């Protein structure tokens, strides 16, 4: 059985000591999906909605990157790491569902999957925030890690 890493020998919450871990390249890809009701999908023009606050998806991309960079301030035991890259992409399918991908990269002693998860999550929340005045019937779902490379083991949801 795998050990929970953020619990110490005294059974108390604890940050993981990464000081002896090897520095390697780490990449993580997370996704989140946003489902829109028809009253919102009717308002999409060229794959985006423009509001008084600006482009919904442009704001969400910026928010996702900003959030990924601040993950250590939001998740108690995440280490502050100097991220090498963070890319957020939002695609709208024909049914009116937005797929948000956040891919983060770092060369460090610890993984970057929480940063990718936070980036995808906050991008989705930003989409909701910017269009909730039109409808509250927006559903954010399936926020998940798609893949990670580096560290003890790689992970790929499509191959597991």
Q: What are these model-predicted stretches?
A:
Residues 1-79, 85-160:
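C-terminal binding/interaction regions
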């Amino acid at each position: 059985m795998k050990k929970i890493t953020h619990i110490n020998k005294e059974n108390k919450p604890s940050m993981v000591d990464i000081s002896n871990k090897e520095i390697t390249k780490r990449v993580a890809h997370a996704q989140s999906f946003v489902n829109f009701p028809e009253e919102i999908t009717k308002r999409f023009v060229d794959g985006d909605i423009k509001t008084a606050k600006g482009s919904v998806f442009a704001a969400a991309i910026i928010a996702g990157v900003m959030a990924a960079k601040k993950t250590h301030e939001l998740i108690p035991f995440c280490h502050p790491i100097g991220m090498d890259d963070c890319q957020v992409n939002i695609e709208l399918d024909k049914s009116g569902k937005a797929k948000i991908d956040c891919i983060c990269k770092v060369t460090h002693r610890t993984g970057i999957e929480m940063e990718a998860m936070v980036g995808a999550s906050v991008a989705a929340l930003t989409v909701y925030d910017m269009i909730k005045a039109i409808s509250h019937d927006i559903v954010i779902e399936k926020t998940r890690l798609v893949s990670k490379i580096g560290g003890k083991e790689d992970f790929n949801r499509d191959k597991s």
